[in-house]
C-alpha cells in the first residue's frame, strides 16, 4: 500500500525549483507506465494468483478487441464514437493537472485520442479515489471558445460560447464536458517533473458506465489532432516510444518522448505506419508470418496483400493483450505451429484454443515466429508467443478475430518507437527492465 500511496504524493517544495517547461524541439523525457496488474497499481489484488490475473487480462483483451469497431447510432447531444472499450486500458500513467498541480492516475492508450479527467461541478460522475479536479482552484485553467481551432466537428459549441464534447466508448461508457486548456505536469524518471502549458483536454462534468474508482481518466496517445501526442508534436519532434516489461516483473514499463524516444543502433527494424480517415489507430502493413521455416502470406477475404494498399492491414495497439488475426489466416498460422511441435495439444483456456503441457524440453520445441512488416521484421521469442495460463500449462498467445491487432504480449521486451514526422514504427529487442 505504501507504493500505491506514493503515486499520489503532492510536491511540497517550490515548483520553480523542481520543474522545467518544455521549450525546445530537442527536449526529451521519460515517464513510468504502470501495468494495471502490477504491485505498483491500485488495481493489484495480492489475494489473486498470477494465473487469475493473467486470465482477467485476456478477458479484457477479448472485450476490447470485440468493441474496437462497434457502430453506434448518433445520439443527442452529438457524440464522438470511440472505438476502444473504456475499462480495458492495460497501462496507467501519472499526470498532474492545473496550477497548483493535482495528481491523477489515468489509462494511457494508443487507441484513444481525447485526454480527459472528471471535473467540478460534477453533474453525473463515477466515484474515484482521488479528489475531483476543480477548475476554479487552478490559475492556468481556460475554457476553449467555440471559435478556437480545436473546436471543429465532431466537437460542438455549447452554452457560454464554450467548446463541448460528448464521447461514447464501444462498451457504452461515456464522458461529457468542456474542451479546455490547462497546464500538465509529468513526473519523469529523471526525478525532475516537466510542465507543459496549454494542453487541450476534456474537463468532464458527466461520466458513467464501466469506469471505476482506480482510474481517473484517459491519456490519449492515438493518431488524431486531439491526442496529447499530436499536441506535443513540435515539442517532441513527433517522437514517442514505449518499452514494456514482462508481466511477472515488478519494474515499471516506460514511455518516452522527444530525444529520449529515438530508437537507434544495432538490430533496429522500421516499418511505415498508416492512418485512416476518422480513425485513431496506427496501422502497419503485415506481408507475411514465418513459423519455423514455413512462410504464410497475409491474404484474407478483407486484405489481398497488395503492397500498393495505403491504409495498412493490422493495428498496433498497446492496450490489447493478445495478437488477433483474421480467422482464416489465424487457422493457417495455428496449423503450421502445431505441425512444428511434436507434443500433443491439451484442452484450451477461454479464447486461447491451443495449449500444451510445459514438460521438460517443450520450450525448445517452440518454433521462432517472425512477423514480416513492410521494410522490417520482428522475431518473436517464446516469451512473446506462449503464456503460462496455469502451472505447467502454456497457451499460444494469439487468437482469431475480425480485426487484425498486434497486441502487447508480442511487443514485450521490445523498444517500440513512433515517428510522426517520418510516419514509421521502429522495433528493437530490448531488456525493458534495464531501459
Feature locations, PLM:
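Aspartyl protease active-site motif detector
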Residues: 92-142, 184, 202, 218-222, ...
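Beta-strand elements of modular eukaryotic interaction domains
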Residues: 81-85, 93-96, 104-106, 173-175, ...
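Extended C-terminal subregions enriched in glycine
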Residues: 345-378
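Glycine-rich flap/beta-hairpin and adjacent strands of clan AA aspartyl proteases
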Residues: 168-281, 371, 377-431
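Disordered propeptide/prodomain
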Residues: 2-106, 114-178, 198, 230-231, ...
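Charged, amphipathic alpha-helical segments
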Residues: 161-169, 223-228, 239, 347-359
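Typically disulfide-stabilized, N-glycosylated extracellular/lumenal ectodomains of secreted
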Residues: 263-264, 292-301, 305-307, 401
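Beta-strand-rich binding-surface signature
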Residues: 90-94, 103-107, 114, 164-166, ...
Amino acid at each position: 500500500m505504501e507504493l500505491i500511496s506514493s503515486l499520489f504524493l503532492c510536491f511540497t517544495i517550490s515548483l520553480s525549483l523542481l520543474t522545467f517547461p518544455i521549450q525546445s524541439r530537442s527536449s526529451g523525457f521519460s515517464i513510468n507506465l504502470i501495468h494495471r496488474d502490477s504491485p505498483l497499481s491500485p488495481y493489484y489484488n495480492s489475494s489473486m494468483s498470477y494465473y487469475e490475473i493473467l486470465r482477467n487480462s485476456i478477458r479484457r483483451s477479448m472485450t476490447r478487441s470485440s468493441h474496437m469497431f462497434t457502430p453506434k447510432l448518433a445520439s443527442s447531444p452529438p457524440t464522438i464514437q470511440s472505438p476502444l472499450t473504456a475499462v480495458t486500458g492495460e497501462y496507467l500513467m501519472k499526470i498532474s493537472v492545473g496550477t497548483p498541480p493535482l495528481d491523477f492516475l489515468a489509462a494511457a492508450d494508443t487507441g484513444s485520442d481525447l485526454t480527459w479527467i472528471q471535473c467540478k461541478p460534477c453533474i453525473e460522475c463515477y466515484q474515484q479515489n482521488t479528489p475531483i479536479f476543480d477548475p476554479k482552484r487552478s490559475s492556468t485553467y481556460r475554457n476553449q471558445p467555440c471559435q478556437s481551432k480545436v473546436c471543429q466537428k465532431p466537437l460542438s459549441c455549447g452554452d457560454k460560447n464554450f467548446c463541448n464534447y460528448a464521447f461514447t466508448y464501444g462498451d457504452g461508457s461515456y464522458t461529457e464536458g468542456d474542451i479546455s486548456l490547462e497546464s500538465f505536469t509529468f513526473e519523469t524518471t529523471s526525478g525532475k517533473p516537466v510542465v507543459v502549458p496549454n494542453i487541450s483536454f476534456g474537463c468532464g462534468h458527466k461520466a458513467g458506465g464501466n469506469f471505476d474508482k482506480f482510474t481517473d481518466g484517459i491519456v490519449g496517445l492515438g493518431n488524431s489532432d486531439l491526442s496529447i501526442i499530436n499536441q506535443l508534436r513540435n515539442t517532441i519532434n513527433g517522437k514517442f516510444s514505449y518499452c514494456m516489461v514482462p508481466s511477472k516483473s515488478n519494474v515499471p514499463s516506460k514511455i518516452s518522448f522527444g530525444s529520449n524516444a529515438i530508437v537507434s543502433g544495432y538490430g533496429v527494424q522500421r516499418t511505415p505506419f498508416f492512418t485512416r480517415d476518422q480513425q485513431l489507430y496506427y496501422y502497419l502493413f503485415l506481408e507475411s508470418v514465418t513459423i519455423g521455416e514455413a512462410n504464410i502470406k497475409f491474404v484474407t477475404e478483407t486484405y489481398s496483400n497488395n503492397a500498393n494498399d495505403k491504409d495498412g492491414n493490422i493495428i498496433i495497439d498497446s492496450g490489447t493483450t493478445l495478437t488477433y488475426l483474421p480467422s482464416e489466416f489465424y487457422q493457417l498460422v495455428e496449423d503450421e505451429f502445431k505441425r512444428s511441435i511434436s507434443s500433443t495439444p491439451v484442452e484450451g483456456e477461454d479464447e486461447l484454443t491451443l495449449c500444451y503441457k510445459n514438460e521438460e524440453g517443450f520450450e525448445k520445441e517452440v518454433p521462432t515466429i517472425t512477423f514480416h512488416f513492410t521494410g522490417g521484421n520482428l522475431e518473436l521469442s517464446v516469451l512473446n508467443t506462449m503464456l503460462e495460463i496455469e502451472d505447467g500449462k502454456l497457451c499460444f498467445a494469439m487468437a482469431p478475430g475480425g480485426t487484425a491487432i498486434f497486441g502487447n504480449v508480442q511487443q514485450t521486451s521490445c523498444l517500440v518507437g513512433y515517428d510522426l514526422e517520418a510516419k514509421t514504427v521502429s522495433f528493437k529487442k530490448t531488456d525493458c527492465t534495464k531501459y
